Amino acid sequence: MSDVRRGLIIVNTGPGKGKTTAAMGTALRAVGQGMRVLMLQFLKGSWHYGELDAVQAFGDKFVMKQMGRGFVKVGAEKPDPEDVKMVEEAWAEGEKAIQSGEWDLVVLDEINYAISYGMLDAAKVVESLKKKPEMVHVILTGRNAHPTIIEAADTVTEMRQVKHAYEKGVMAQRGIEY
């Protein structure tokens, strides 16, 4: 085994809880190692999440941007044009950030949802990832990761739910799930 060092493409997917949380843990570790991190949340809107306050403590070492409305209209034959526009804007910013080399780690939170809902082309994302600067790491999160995304990735983790408190009527807990 060689001692190869290069930026990784990491996918956190699957139906279980913890995809974004795992990405946040990796981001925190990266900041602790002196790296700069950008996290773009493709679908989350202006709702308040605890991690937003925590990230502010890192200044320009860890920047998080919410790029969506906070919800997506699903079930229609075609995605809502407003959702598509917001996803395209988020992707344009993400692609620019990745290619700039300004960030050591770029987290594309919930991008897999955007792709699976037909709001973004997986092939376009993969093509851009293939051109990224050598030492830039990218994490893509969300359920239903597209097969071409999985193929392009170096590491793929599938989260699966074994048991969840919600099934017993316990609502989401502040500081734990938001």
Report residues per predicted region:
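Conserved nucleotide-binding/hydrolysis micro-motifs of P-loop NTPases
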Residues: 43-46, 70-71, 112-113, 144-147, ...
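Hydrophobic/aromatic ligand-binding patch that stacks against planar heteroaromatic rings
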Residues: 29, 54, 128, 148-149
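Phosphate-binding/switch loop-helix module in NTP-utilizing enzymes
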Residues: 74-137
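Conserved P-loop
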Residues: 8-99
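Phosphate-binding/switch region of NTP-binding enzymes
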Residues: 143-178
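ASCE RecA-like P-loop NTPase motor cores
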Residues: 8, 137-140
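Short, glycine/charged-enriched secondary-structure capping and boundary segments
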Residues: 25-26, 52-55, 80, 120-124, ...
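Extreme N-terminal, non-catalytic leader segments
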Residues: 1-9
